[in-house]
């Protein structure tokens, strides 16, 4: 039941479903010695709520209790990557490969290698997967990861081809949102609304629609922007952590408020250090006329290391 509510929360962007997922665990929510299956679900719920420290603690307990649990290592790698612990993420991915030679482990390692500028990583994973029968859900995820790898490496034609297939294949809206970002970055806002027309109206989807409609001077933009403003408004004047990335980008690209965007992007960087977060902080610092505010990104590029042609162009 908890997993079902969490899946709905991810798919529909409905906060109530995440709360129901937590409630479904009952007393297990606060017990450190929960069964491994419960620890995995609890970690996923915490990850969804951006409690990455709590999620990793649960996953550490899970792999301590069952060191051969592939899903625990995969989830651990994903959160470590999100929080910028790239070396630890690679170690977790290697555990997956050692345990099962799982495709996801190889994709994870290739993704991390591409972040270090390994131009051959994309081709290696493509060769490994060529001709293999993979389920639709896994295929959509893998194609999206490959597309993001290609984009970071500056291989835009390959990225677009992969994004297009991923958007048609993957469940949920993540692939379509990622493709929408690609289109927006290449001045193709006119293609975004059709791409997202049937996507669940999550905050991420609405943000891309707002950007596209605004850039194409579509009269529907005002209503979408108003809905986003309502959703992202912090309760009682308090800014939480769940929507920091979306709030920062909304402030920067929709509202044109670079100072607020920089504050939000800086706070977001303290939690999440994915390429999208680095790009956001660098862009906000540049727009606000405060290049020194992008220093944490420059440091991250040096150690643990992050190669992204978009980021290097932005920081020049």
Where are these regions (language model features)?
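Start-of-helix register in tetratricopeptide repeats
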Residues: 3, 37, 71, 104-105, ...
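Residue-level recognition of tetratricopeptide repeat
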Residues: 3, 7-10, 44, 78, ...
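Register position in tetratricopeptide repeats
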Residues: 7, 48, 82-83, 115-116, ...
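TPR-repeat structural position
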Residues: 11, 15-18, 52, 86, ...
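Canonical positions in the second alpha-helix
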Residues: 24-28, 61-62, 95-96, 128-132, ...
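Short coil turns that delineate tetratricopeptide repeat
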Residues: 33, 67, 100-101, 134-137, ...
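Canonical tetratricopeptide repeat
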Residues: 41, 75, 108-109, 145, ...
């Amino acid at each position: 039941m908890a997993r079902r509510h969490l899946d709905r929360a991810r798919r529909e962007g409905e906060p109530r479903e995440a709360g129901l997922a937590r409630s479904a665990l009952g007393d297990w929510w606060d017990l450190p010695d929960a069964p491994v299956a419960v620890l995995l679900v609890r970690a996923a719920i915490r990850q969804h709520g951006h409690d990455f420290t709590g999620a990793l603690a649960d996953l550490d307990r899970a792999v301590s209790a069952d060191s051969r649990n592939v899903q625990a290592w995969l989830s651990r790698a994903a959160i470590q990557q999100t929080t910028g612990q790239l070396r630890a993420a690679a170690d977790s991915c290697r555990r997956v490969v050692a345990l099962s030679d799982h495709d996801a482990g190889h994709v994870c390692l290739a993704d991390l290698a591409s972040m270090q500028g390994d131009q051959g990583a994309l081709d290696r994973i493509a060769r490994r997967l060529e001709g293999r029968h993979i389920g639709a859900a896994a295929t959509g995820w893998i194609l999206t990861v490959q597309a993001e790898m290609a984009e970071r490496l500056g291989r835009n034609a390959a990225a677009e081809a992969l994004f297009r297939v991923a958007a048609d294949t993957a469940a949920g809206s993540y692939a379509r949102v990622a493709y929408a970002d690609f289109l927006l970055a290449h001045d193709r806002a006119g293609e975004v609304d059709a791409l997202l027309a049937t996507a669940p109206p999550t905050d991420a989807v609405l943000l891309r629609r707002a950007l596209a409609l605004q850039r194409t001077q579509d009269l529907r933009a005002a209503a979408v922007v108003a809905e986003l403003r309502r959703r992202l408004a912090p309760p009682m004047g308090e800014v939480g952590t769940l929507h920091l990335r979306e709030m920062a980008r909304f402030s920067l690209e929709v509202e044109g408020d670079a100072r607020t965007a920089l504050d939000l992007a800086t706070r977001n960087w303290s939690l999440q250090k994915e390429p999208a977060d680095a790009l956001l902080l660098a862009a906000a610092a540049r727009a606000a006329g405060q290049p020194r505010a992008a220093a944490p990104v420059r440091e991250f590029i040096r150690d643990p290391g992050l190669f992204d042609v978009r980021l290097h162009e932005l920081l020049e």
